[in-house]
């Protein structure tokens, strides 16, 4: 492992109580994501927090696959999307009303408006996906996920998240299922976690942060895992999407515009298909038929 790598996820466990934890700190991954779009500060912060949360929760994937987390709303912010895989890769993007005024202090609920929802999908590499959709509870990504984990997973969880323009970080504590834990002990360890500041979460690595919080009852810390940005878009996937649209619609666009282009929301890669490409997808007969029909109607 590269000793200078700052995109790390670190597991830890307390030997004297049934509590496990995770710390994640993303620098290069996060900078790669925010360099692709000019995110308003409040949306950038919310997306970074969801990215850190996805990196934390994807560690629980028991099969090869992808965890997809979406926050959807009807306000100025339309959607946050994070995908994190069992191969320790992740990507993220957001959609918002680019004509709206968005500053740096708006809360998640301010941005989403009424009737926000949280959608979580587990997409195994082999097998059927599982999806849960719940109303948005809480005013932040951390509060939303805490409610979700308790209600849907029956796991008592404490999550702290932070993000700025350079770093996205998170800390998770979780009671081990089917283990007895004194309520005072859980209250104590979560109270210690509550003392962390956003600045500490963003600036300190796992070793220093865990010592700062839990030096009286130090946890056992495991070897960190390296996380990377990776986008799964491809020309082949865009071709499949165009095939689903149908030859008539795609050929009509190409006949009018000269080509059809599709941009990846996650990495901004542009895929351009001209008449030759569309001929290869649908056959020259389909394209020529559309062109002849357009000439007839003119």
Residue ranges of model-derived segments:
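Cys/His-clustered metal-coordination modules, chiefly Zn-binding fingers
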Residues: 194-298
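Interaction interfaces in information-processing and related assembly proteins
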Residues: 2-223, 291-297
């Amino acid at each position: 492992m590269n000793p200078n790598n700052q995109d790390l996820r670190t597991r830890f466990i307390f030997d004297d109580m049934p509590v496990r934890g995770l710390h994640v700190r993303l620098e290069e991954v996060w900078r790669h994501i925010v360099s692709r779009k000019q995110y308003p500060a409040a949306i950038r912060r919310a997306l970074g927090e969801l990215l850190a949360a996805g990196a934390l929760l994807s560690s629980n994937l028991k099969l090869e696959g992808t965890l997809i987390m979406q926050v959807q709303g009807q306000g100025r912010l339309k959607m946050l999307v994070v995908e994190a895989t069992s191969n320790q890769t992740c990507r993220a993007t957001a959609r918002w009303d680019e004509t709206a005024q968005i500053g740096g202090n708006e809360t998640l609920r301010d941005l989403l408006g009424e009737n926000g929802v949280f959608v979580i999908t587990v997409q195994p590499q082999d097998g059927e996906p599982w999806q849960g959709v719940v109303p948005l509870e809480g005013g932040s990504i951390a509060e939303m996920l805490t409610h979700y984990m308790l209600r849907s997973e029956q796991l008592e969880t404490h999550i702290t998240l932070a993000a700025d323009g350079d770093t996205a970080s998170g800390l998770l504590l979780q009671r081990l299922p089917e283990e007895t834990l004194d309520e005072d002990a859980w209250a104590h360890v979560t109270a210690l976690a509550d003392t962390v500041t956003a600045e500490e979460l963003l600036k300190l690595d796992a070793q220093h942060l865990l010592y700062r919080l839990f030096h009286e009852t130090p946890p056992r810390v495991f070897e960190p895992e390296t996380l990377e940005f990776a986008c799964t878009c491809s020309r082949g996937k865009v071709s499949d999407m165009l095939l689903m649209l149908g030859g008539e619609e795609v050929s009509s666009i190409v006949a009018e515009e000269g080509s059809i282009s599709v941009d990846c929301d996650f990495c901004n890669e542009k895929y351009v298909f001209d008449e030759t490409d569309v001929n290869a997808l649908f056959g020259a007969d389909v394209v020529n038929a559309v062109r002849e029909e357009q000439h007839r109607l003119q």
